[in-house]
Amino acid sequence: MALRCPIVSVLGHVDHGKTSLLDKIRSTRVTQREAGGITQHIGASEIPINTIKKVSKDLLGLFNANLSIPGLLVIDTPGHEAFTSLRKRGGALADIAILVVDINEGFKPQTIEAINILKQCKTPFVVAANKLDRIPGWSSSNGPFILNFNEKVQHPNAMTEFEIRLYENVIKHLNELGFDADLFSRVKDTTRTINVVPVSAITGEGVPDLLIIIAGLAQKFLEQKLALNVEGYAKGTVLEVKEEKGLGRTIDAIIYDGIARTGDYIVIGNPDGIVTSKVKALLKPKELDEMRDPKDKFKPSREISAATGVKISAPELEMVVSGSPLRIVPKEHINKAMDEITEEIEEFTIKTDEEGIIIKADTMGSLEAIANELRKAKANIKKAEVGDVSKKDIIEASSYSSSDPLNGLIISFNTKTLPDAKLELEKTDVKLLEGKIIYKLVEDYGAWLKEMEELLKSDELNKLTKPAMIKILPNCIFRQKGPAVCGVEILYGTLKIGSHIMSDDGKKLGYVKEIRNNQQENIKEAKVGMQVPVSIDGNMILGRNAKENDILYVEVSEPEVRKLYHIYKDELRGDEKEALLRYMELKQKLEKSIFWGM
């Protein structure tokens, strides 16, 4: 059975050494002149199995590595944004991943986010515990870690420090996330235990161990997945859309199965539909020593087979976006390929809600990833699209917010905001959150949501009528009626202009027309403990339906009482709560229902 190269992606937290490790892996070769060294593909680097065997020759016997895969195809773009963008039907394009963790710093937010994405995509991974050379006293040199890991080479204190950092900063965190993990040389059951491979991207220590472990695991557990359809047509994913001088718009793609030929037809799935076009050229990069003219960087290939990175030149690629699924087929298979692509796009369709926010992303895979994370944060999503933030998006978000201010949000992942959209944004209350890190955008969403909920809660609370109890002061009746004017003391709560007043037998007496302070200045409200003159317009006649020392109540509707009691009770001051409870007790007695207000 013919096997293709496993596709390998590198993930990890910022500054933990993803790019440096990739550079070190790409530069792996026994000598500069070695035949079959690293082959640079479009968007990926192929490390042939012979190169892996040569740099790892001291390890082959230790791990009983009988490797028959042709090599490893390592995606050039590190990070989980690239990982999520590169999708195929059924999950991630990458067959296996390297999770880079700084052995000295341990897990960070992006490390955990990367693990969550790997779990979600069911992608097996190996941990590269990087920056081994920074452990105090560690003697790091290019070559296998396993040969350098002994007390003949290392000081005992350095060995002890290594063990502490390996456990405290890497293995313990993996255990907390539900994974068994251990140093790769101690792993007995690779189906249950994550391999942790210590490396230094600076010295190259551990890179041979990492390559042999990745290759061995891929062959052992992914053989069926790596079976190559040597007769079938090419299946792949768009990595990037680029303008190239002399070629126009081209696409860089990873082909993960089958064979593509010049003159075949490319079928690409887009959010807006399917694009078909005739392949003008399949291009591979020239070797470095052939790149004398920067305008002539590529050489045409009549035929390419998986797994590989390739640049494709074809007309009518304007609407293609990164992360789109593709097929390259003979003309007679176009309809079949279109059906496959349609089914694949349906897998990417994100379920939307009747109400919610808008999310935009640069690729379908990224859109799916951020939608999944926002769902975990309990976000409702009204619209999810690939592409830049447009004026139309702002207008739509503004209309969504008219029914609920919590819908007036656009989350933009790794996309631009068009100039007319920026102008429209200034005219509205729509909030735009932009970023290139998924976990940070989700955090920003959580912070915005909390702030908005508090603001809305405060606004609604301020609009509600709050209970208050007042007492008519003796010797302070200034006018009997039309309006009645008297001095009152606020016993509980806050008395406001416009509040409707009732007696303790439920009679409506009128509304508060005016409140004055001791300087005879009009004020809008009087709080607990204050003694103030008030005028009450309506049915109140002092000396008849209201007398000195009477306790009066601010009238509150039952729906408002329910909201105050069930939603906002914790937001009320102690005296306001007391006013609410006493008012409810009075109304339950008057209405002869213990459920009033409940």
UniProtKB/Swiss-Prot annotation:
Region feature (G4): 130-133
Residue ranges of the region described as G1: 12-19
MF terms (GO), sorted A to Z: GTP binding; GTPase activity; translation initiation factor activity
Region listing for G3, in residue ranges: 76-79
Keyword Isomerase: no
Listed InterPro entries: EFTU-type, P-loop_NTPase, Small_GTP-bd, T_Tr_GTP-bd_dom, TF_aIF-2_arc, TIF_IF2, TIF_IF2_dom3, TIF_IF2_dom3_sf
Domain tr-type G, residue spans: 3-225
Binding site for GTP: 12-19, 76-80, 130-133
Keyword GTP-binding: yes
Function of the molecule: Function in general translation initiation by promoting the binding of the formylmethionine-tRNA to ribosomes. Seems to function along with eIF-2.
PANTHER family, per the entry: EUKARYOTIC TRANSLATION INITIATION FACTOR 5B, TRANSLATION INITIATION FACTOR IF-2-RELATED
Name of the protein described by the UniProt record: Probable translation initiation factor IF-2
Originating species: Methanococcus vannielii (strain ATCC 35089 / DSM 1224 / JCM 13029 / OCM 148 / SB)
